[in-house]
Amino acid sequence: AGDIALESVNQSLVDAAVNQFGRLDIAVNNAGIAHQPAPVHQMTEDIIDRQFAVNVKGVMFGMKYQIPVMLAQKQGHIMNVSSLAGLGGAPKGAAYAAAKHAVAGVTRTAAVEYGRKNVRVNAICPFYSPTNILNVDGYNTPEAQAQLGMGSPMKRLADPQEIVNTMLLLLSPGNSYMNGQTIAVDGGVTAW
């Protein structure tokens, strides 16, 4: 599909969805990248720029084109994927954490701006799950992932399907009053 950090790619994705389905009831902004671990004083301009380009601009450009379609339909729901790092700190991951905090902020802002027009915007903040993002951090072995999982009260990583199930629950018609929320899917990490 292309580089999600580019506005034109986001516009093309929304146009393609509307052309194929005739409308856009739900949109999920789930592109994200991590960076090699480094403390704040070692962050480079390239690391910071790329984190914000993909993790923030990708979400904002997606919403820029999703929202007008939903406003014309008089309804819609946008689900942004932030991260547990977007609710707290991330040692040696400051650029990633800052970008994911920005996703939570734009989620809340858009929820306030468009809620009265029946366009809801929420975000989920998942704990680690065995996906490609762990390869960037060097946690691509079963042993390393098991160690990461020990950071959760459930003593394991999130299964990707558990994250999807949470999204489906939040996107369901019976959940139509939830708006502007960032929900942790973390096995209880934020309860500590």
Where is each model-derived feature located?
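Active-site helix of classical SDR
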Residues: 63, 99, 107
